[in-house]
C-alpha cells in the first residue's frame, strides 16, 4: 500500500437533491418516470400474465413496438432529454453540457413557465452554468465521514480487478458504500435512484400540492437493471434468488405506487405522466 498526501479537492460540488420530489403543482405537472432496462417485450408478457396491470395503466398509451435509441443508459438518457445523437465529436462532457443547456424540451418548458427538476444519479458534467436551470440541483459543501472507511471501499474497488480470483468475492462494492462516507451540508437529502429508496420515500412521504408555478420532473430509477435483487413487491432478496422478471415486476410495483400516490394527492388529473 502506498501512502500519499491527502487529495486536493474542492469542498463544494453540484449535488442532486430530493428537493420537492413529491411536491406537485396545483396547476399543471409533467413527469417522466424512467424505469431503467425495462424491455417492452417483458412488459407485453407481464400484461398477459397479470390482467390487473391493465387496470393500473388504464389511462396510458402503450407502444409495443418502441425501441430505444441506444443499448446503454449513459447514451439513452441524454437522447431522451435532448434528442441529439452523440457522434464522438468532442468530449462526452461537452455533449452533456449542450444537452442540459440547449435541449428543446427544457427550452419549451422554461418558455411555458415550468419549474424544472432533474432526479438523476449521473450528471456526467460539473458545469454549474449548464445545470443552473434545475431547481433541485444545488451547490453543496462535501465532507468525508471517515477516511479509513472510504479507503477500504477504494481498496475493495481496486481489488475486484487485481486481487486473485478466489479473493474477488470479498471485493464487491456498491455505490451506496461510498455514498455513506460522503456527508453533504445543504439541508436536503440526496437523490438515490435505487428502487428500494424510492419505494421507502413513497411510503414515508405523501405527495403534496402547492400553488407555485407548473412543475416538470424527470425521475430516473434503476428499474429492471442488474443486479436482480428484488421480488415482485420490490422487497430486497438474495441475489441468488433474483431474476430479471422479478425486477421488472418490482418496477411495475413502483410505478403503480407512484400513480396511486398521485391519485390520493389530487394531482393525478393535472399531471402528464
Provide a role label for each language-model segment.
Residues 1-9:
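Transmembrane and membrane-interface helices of multi-pass
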Residues 231-251:
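A solvent-exposed, charged loop/short amphipathic helix patch at secondary-structure junctions
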